[in-house]
Amino acid sequence: MCCFLLVSVLLATTLTDVASAQRWRQTSGGGKDRWDGLLDPLDADLRRDIIRYGELAQATSDALIGDPASPFAGASRYAPDAFLRKVRASDPDAYRVTRFVYATSSVRLPDAFMPRPAPSAGAAWSGESNWMGYVAVAADGVAANAGRRDIVVAWRGTKRAVEWANDLDITLVPADGVVGPGPGWTQPSVHRGFLSVYTSKSFSSPFNKLSAREQVLAEITRLLRAYKNENCSITITGHSLGAALSTLNAIDIVANGYNVRGSSRVPVPVTAIALASPRVGDDQFKRAFDSTPNLSLLRVRNAPDIVPTILPSAFFKDVGAELLVDTRRSPYLKNPAGPAQWHNLECYLHAVAGTQGAGDGAGFSLVVDRDLALVNKEVDALRDEYQVPAAWWVEKNKGMVQNASGRWVLQDHEEGNLAM
């Protein structure tokens, strides 16, 4: 009898694990239908997943020092240790940051892409590099519950996207080294600026002797080796510019075999959650992306946001599947609003939490209980009756502290914030 009960328990556990794994493959777009039937109406598990990864992307914005008066403009305010706790992530212990990522560019970009210290700020931490995100890995408990070890790459976006959107050129260049020609497509081309941020290096900068691409790929390789005996997944996420970098990063990992480990040669699935993403590449890039196995991308687009469509569709093509949301349907937000609110990531996540479909008659209901105050972190979007000040996410006293002599000095970062 005891043996029978033990076998029954083991069988039930195995069936539960299998069902959980199958469900995860479905919500990560890994099934043959790639989110078909899960987007309208939005599946409950997928809704929570989008918000989870969106919050990991939001952490990059929350930590960025953007004030050009600071010598540390363009750097992270916090060190990797306890990073998600410092940015007040909703589940700060679910992932552990293992590496910061830095980028530079060999071509001229809009100033908003990479904030840098003003000449009057004094000795700058770097004149060439910017902190561009991080790599993290799921904690033991989270991995055990999920049945897999999730590796996340979170790419930083820009705080002033509506300013750079109209200053963005439309130059396409071959995506050499990232993705090449294949069965059914010729050499893909991608946006020159996005590719430059992803692949540029500078031997004069200690932060970019390796490109952002090389830093991320090296860390993914290291983590896959560290967890070689576990089921793993790779999730890439970002908002705005970060979403464009996520798109490049995701196909790069799969096209060049960085998701294949050991003698088993079994590929690790790669999923990108791209929020408010501009288009990245041409029709050949689209063919390559949408034809590559073990690669899925979900674009989340707010209907009135101009950034996802700013690059002309005659030259640039959307990739992956699309989840369309509309912040104008929320009864909690000011209406009319403007481009800054429509593009803001917290407003996006609010829309994901409440969307009831893309149809004309679809309503809005916050089925995920996200704090309304988050909407006003960086913008003035929440209706006045909720009594939440606009753009309230600021460092106390803007980073000014009183030293031992009683004088006020700028101390807007913690020790170790320039870790690699």
From Swiss-Prot:
Q: Where in the cell is it found?
A: Secreted
Q: Which residues are glycosylated?
A: 231, 294, 403
- Family membership, please give it: Belongs to the AB hydrolase superfamily. Lipase family.
Q: Name one Pfam family in it.
A: Lipase_3
Q: Which organism is it from?
A: Oryza sativa subsp. indica
The active site lies at: 240 (acyl-ester intermediate), 240 (charge relay system), 305 (charge relay system), 343 (charge relay system)
| Documented EC number(s) | 3.1.1.-
Functional description taken from the UniProt entry: Acylhydrolase that catalyzes the hydrolysis of phospholipids at the sn-1 position.
**What is this protein's name?**
Phospholipase A1-II 3
Q: Which GO terms describe its molecular function?
A: phospholipase A1 activity
Signal sequence, start to end = 1-21
Query: Where does the protein principally reside?
Result: secreted
Tell me the keywords, alphabetical order: Coiled coil, Glycoprotein, Hydrolase, Lipid degradation, Lipid metabolism, Secreted, Signal
